[in-house]
């Protein structure tokens, strides 16, 4: 598997080609392989003079011979010696860069900018970032800065609902559901319980009026399950769940039922994600795949009391483990199960490791943790991605997954590794200096997205690391806490 070679060109999302069919890398499709090109081999940041010019700014090509990742030269973890908290140097660098990133976002993406309103790629992301800054720092200026973004986002909710009815989207990231959650949170923080309740009703309606076309995290039912957790975690306690538990359990049960149908059709266990059962894209990762669906189902305690659902989830995770490469990575999709390429939150080892650790926490199954640990070794080796700092398919997401692994396992090695990645980023102008780094523009689907843009993803990560610390950092939009 390590010898498989690929080449890449930038294309829009959702494109399918033949015979080389698009992979959900959000920006890549297979083309004929270049000689001696191996996407599993990383390139040393200390030898940039040897890197072809098209591989760095301003072109930032992802085509061969450009590598997928930078070589990780950080030393291995030594218990009791390696740092697992922010050093003074890292803290100073974050304190310097966070205001620069915020200033750039304000100037290039003001509330009046003609973006969509979603959390994934639009104005809602900026509203959420300022609300997070307010929550983490207690500084009222951030709440004031959030308000224009919240207002601009709220003005787009009704039009987004129309789009969602046409597409069947109900996920927190890609639909009006996330926008309504953020608007409810802003109203809650402003002390307007009635207004917050109106937006909560928007979310509740998705549970009662049908849960859409998809089951994946980004656009479907798994993301809707997350929305219920987000409201309960972040809004003022109301004495009862904001989304009634029978509605949450009902949605989770329907996802299990659809997953069972997909398993029968595909001939293997699997919780269905994005496309219908006859589609050939059975994805494995967090965005549109099995990992993202299982991750959210495991957060529904009522489901774990159902023997049928419990058995199905365990069979699904057992099957996922069976798909792991010798490298520790996982395929992007079932029907291209020999492609050991992507090592990022949405596809590959990082996101799948998180789901396996959640399964280990729920079931105590040692094989799930062992598989996750092999996957995290792959992240350590190949997780300094050329694409940038974004959450979805960049270094940021891989830092978050290592912090998550540290929280679930208690193994400080993963927190050290997250901070080692951070140290590499902050000490390398090519990765973090705004005049040198790879900007998000080359990505065609969401140049300034909360998940697909280096600037906004970094603002979220820098905020938590500075003001909450690595042990308490929470990947908003995936973990429930703001």
What is the meaning of each model-derived region?
Residues 47, 52, 89-112, 144-162, ...:
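Long, well-ordered core segments of solenoidal/helical folds
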Residues 236-369, 382:
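Extended ligand-binding clefts on enzyme/binding-domain cores
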Residues 27-152, 246-269:
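Low-complexity, Ser/Thr/Pro/Gly-enriched N-terminal "stalk/linker" regions
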């Amino acid at each position: 598997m390590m010898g498989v070679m690929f080449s890449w060109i930038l294309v829009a999302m959702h494109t399918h080609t033949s015979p080389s069919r698009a992979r959900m890398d959000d920006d890549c499709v297979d083309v004929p392989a270049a000689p001696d090109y191996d996407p599993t081999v990383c390139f040393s940041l200390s030898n940039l003079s040897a890197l072809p010019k098209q591989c760095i700014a301003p072109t930032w090509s992802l085509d061969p011979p450009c590598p997928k990742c930078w070589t990780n030269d950080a030393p291995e973890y030594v218990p009791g010696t390696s740092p697992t908290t922010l050093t003074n140097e890292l803290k100073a660098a974050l304190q310097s860069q966070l205001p620069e990133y915020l200033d750039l976002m304000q100037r290039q993406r003001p509330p009046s900018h003609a973006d969509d309103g979603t959390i994934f790629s639009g104005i809602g992301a900026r509203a959420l970032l300022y609300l997070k800054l307010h929550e983490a720092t207690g500084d009222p200026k951030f709440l004031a800065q959030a308000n224009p973004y919240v207002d601009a986002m709220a003005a787009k909710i009704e039009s987004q609902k129309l789009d969602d009815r046409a597409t069947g989207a109900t996920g927190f990231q890609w639909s009006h559901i996330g926008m309504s959650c953020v608007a409810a949170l802003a109203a809650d923080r402003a002390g307007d319980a009635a207004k917050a309740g109106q937006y909560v009703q928007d979310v509740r309606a998705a549970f009662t009026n049908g849960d859409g076309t998809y089951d994946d995290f980004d656009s479907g039912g798994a993301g809707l399950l997350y929305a219920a957790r987000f409201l309960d975690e972040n809004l003022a306690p109301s004495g009862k769940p904001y989304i009634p538990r029978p509605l949450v359990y009902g949605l989770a049960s329907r996802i299990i039922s659809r997953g069972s149908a997909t398993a029968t059709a595909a001939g293997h266990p699997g919780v269905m994600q994005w496309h219908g059962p006859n589609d050939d894209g059975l994805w494995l990762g967090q965005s549109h795949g099995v990992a993202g669906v299982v991750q959210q189902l495991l957060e529904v305690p009522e489901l774990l009391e159902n023997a049928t659902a419990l058995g199905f989830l365990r069979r699904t995770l057992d099957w996922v483990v069976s798909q792991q490469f010798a490298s520790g990575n996982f395929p992007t999709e079932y029907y291209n199960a020999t492609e050991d390429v992507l090592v990022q939150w949405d596809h590959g080892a990082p996101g799948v490791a998180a789901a396996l650790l959640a399964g280990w926490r729920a079931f105590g199954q040692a094989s799930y943790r062992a598989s996750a640990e092999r996957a995290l070794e792959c992240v350590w080796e190949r997780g300094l991605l050329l694409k940038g700092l974004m959450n979805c398919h960049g270094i940021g997401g891989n830092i978050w997954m290592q912090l998550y692994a540290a929280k679930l396992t208690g193994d400080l090695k993963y927190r050290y590794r997250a901070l080692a990645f951070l140290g590499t980023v902050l000490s390398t102008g090519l990765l973090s200096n705004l005049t040198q780094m790879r900007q998000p523009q080359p990505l065609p689907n969401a140049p300034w997205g909360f998940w697909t843009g280096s600037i906004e993803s970094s603002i979220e990560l820098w905020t938590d690391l500075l003001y909450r610390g690595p042990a308490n950092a929470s990947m908003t939009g995936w973990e429930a806490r703001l």
